[in-house]
Amino acid sequence: MKRKSDSEQQPSVQCRKKKRIEELGLNLSSTSDDDTQYSNHGTQESSTSSTSSDSDNEEKRPVFGSGRNETLPDTLAEGSSSHYSMYNSVSQKLMAKMGFREGEGLGKFGQGRKEIVETSKQKGRRGLGMVLKGFEKELNINWRSEPEATAYEEVDWFPECTTDIPDSDELSDWMIVGKRKLIIDDETEFCRDNLLTSLLQCKSAFDELEGEEMRRARTRSNPYEMIRGVFFLNRAAMKMANIDHVFDYMFTNPKDSQGKPKLKDKESELLYFADVCAGPGGFSEYVLWRKKWHAKGFGMTLKGPNDFKLEDFYAAPSELFEPYYGEGGVDGDGDVTRPENITAFRNFILDNTDHKGVHFMMADGGFSVEGQENIQEILSKQLLLCQFLVGLHVIRTGGHFICKTFDLFTPFSVGLIYLLYCCFERVCLFKPLTSRPANSERYVVCRGLKEGIDDVRNYLFNVNRRLNHLRNSDQDVTLVVPLEVLRGDKQFNEYMVRSNESCCEVQIKALAKIHAFVQDSTLSESRQADIRRECLKLWGVPDQARVAPTNTDARTKFFQLIQSQNIEVFGYKPTPLTAKTLEKLIHVFDYRCMVCGSEPKFLLGLGRSQIYTWGGRSNERWTRLDLKTELPRDTLLSVEIVHELKGEGKAQRKISAIHVLDVLFLNGTDVRTQHFTQRIQLAEKFVRAVAKPSRPDMNPIRVKEVYRLEDIEKIFLRLDMKHIKSSGGYLRLSYTGRDDRHFVPCGLYIVKTINEPWSMAYSKSQKRKYFYNSKTKNSQFELPVESIAPFHTCYYERLFWEWGEGVQIHDSQRRDPDSDKLSKDAVLQFIQAHHPCMPSSLTEDR
């Protein structure tokens, strides 16, 4: 029997081995170390076949090794045309030595993986192999064409409204009720269809994306992201800082039509503002940081986890902010959609702003619309209306308004903007660079509330009532201004369309940019740190970290404030007013006087309810004030704790109040060198700022009523004999203050406000007071700076007229003939003798 040759036998063996491998079901995408070594042998045979078809196939792939067809092109050779040519020559040679040919795997039978192992596409914490459908594809939007990031912004105002404010007759037919609508796709009246469609598609692309992955990409892609909140409570504070600067500080430093500031820190008027739907309070923290105790804020927001967090105001004195939650006051719910809350909030503000209203109102309302982001505008329509409505209720004529909005595609939203456009002198839709470009957030900024807006306010009030009535039905208010009116005002309509489309384009590019940053984690914005520095410098905000205020004991803080001043002056007792010392009052115009109710002491505020008192002597300790009140940190006052009374008999009520005699530091501001009259004026301003009329449980703070010595008779007119509960039924001398509360006086403080050698006199020819220098014989009408008596001079040279037993102050009292104490008549006679004839209506402050 003839034996087969080796060449005939070997192919059949190889075929059997290959068949065996396939029967075992081996994974052909990988090879074992042994297989690799075996396939790399130089004696490896090619798998060519004698058939023509096999030969044709063989010619289409590269062959490596001594046993392969050497005439075939080497597609891994350097410079050859192949998608493997991207690899360097070393890699190609290594693969060639292992016998690799394009289109075939490694291994003896080419059973190895044929494709290159792809780089990992794992994204964040996604599950292995997870692919988000619809997100991996390209958006085909050129986001790289966005303008270069800059700290400078421009304001584009609506054209000035030339039509009259609509009246009640015209408004009566404007509200339209229709079927409730929960889609936004067809709202193309104020935006091109293709832009709206692209925007919604871009938003929808993120529906399946994990929130954390989205946030990381957003953080890397936004050139302004590093601005964050700086040292404030949150990012909202920096948005307000951004907007305030861009609009020339019209909120924190309002100006008149000539560009002059309406308010000055040295004057008595406060800057009143309201913060609505704005918990935890970032907007207010910024305003109070900028203005300190020269501003007073009122706030209303929904109670709950997003309430005002005043304890977290690290940068500003939260004691100057008073939350009020509508009906029920501090016990209300703060729901801005309830008409009762709107009315109560309005009344509260008018009662505490001399019935004028606030200088400006901020509103930053919003709520979670997770899963329904595309119709956020529709879901928040009533919130937007109510914020506008509260603004028209509480802002004074000439005041300003700022409110957050979202998309403004629906005629309902645009109608609300139109009503503001009619009610304010100028209106602007503005997106600050601190607002992330990928969201639909914008702010409507309104300057100068006009007179005669009552009909619009009442109309919106009725619209809100209707919305509440339709809340659980399939009906809704679809229009507040007819479409023909919105279309008819061409300037308004063109601005509205231009603003919407511009915001759409910015948002689409920003979303596409985030999409790209999600897909490529190596992308980042390189100028974030530089942009942050530029913006903070431009806005006047220090580049500092947020740090909680340090706690300091009262004694240490006191010495930090007064620094090198002699502490002995705080222990000086007033000079008793007697027949001998009465001659000190010869220059009557130099003195002011106040009714005393108890022993004076110094009061130091360390923030919130941390308040301490001290008697003034070096051997005394600072003790915690046992009263319920709040003061900003770094506040040092000269005060009395007085038991005030209201009513008489059994219904008489007593409350302990803080009466301010003089001020040294107000929230860190040193006022000791100011004129006494100026210090008292600033004290009254400060007390109005920290007052909490909504908190009857707190002990009040009041400033003593100050009288000129020549007007001392006005004090006696406010003295009366009253029944005091603790006096055993006897009548006691009582002094009634401005708020109809009375207390038992113990004497009169007389304070010298002019430094020697200066004194005040009266010119009969000019019929006005003037200042006279006894050394230089110089006289002038303007107040000489060197004549101002600072705090320590006033405190050291003050006199005290005691109203004790035997002193006749009231006509019903009896004078002790053996007493050497001064009576009312004796003091009045002295003052009248040294008081030049002067019109009683003359009321100079100094």
Swiss-Prot record:
Residue spans of biased composition, Polar residues class = 27-45
Catalyzed reaction equations = a 5'-end (N(7)-methyl 5'-triphosphoguanosine)-ribonucleoside in mRNA + S-adenosyl-L-methionine = a 5'-end (N(7)-methyl 5'-triphosphoguanosine)-(2'-O-methyl-ribonucleoside) in mRNA + S-adenosyl-L-homocysteine + H(+)
Q: What is the E.C. number?
A: 2.1.1.57
Presence of the UniProt keyword Cell division in the record: no
Determine the domain of life of the protein's source: Eukaryota
Q: Motif Bipartite nuclear localization signal: where?
A: 2-20
Stretch forming the signal peptide: none
Boundaries of every G-patch domain copy: 87-133
Residues engaged in binding S-adenosyl-L-methionine: N234, C277, A278, G279, P280, G281, G282, F283, D335, V336
Q: Where is the WW domain?
A: 752-786
Region annotation Disordered: where it falls in the sequence: 1-81
Q: Name one GO cellular component term.
A: nucleus
Write down what this protein is called. Cap-specific mRNA (nucleoside-2'-O-)-methyltransferase 1
RrmJ-type SAM-dependent 2'-O-MTase domain segment(s): 231-450
Query: Which residues are noted in the entry as substrate-binding?
Result: K203, S204, A205, F206, D207, R218, N374, I375, Q376, N439
- List S-S links within the chain: none
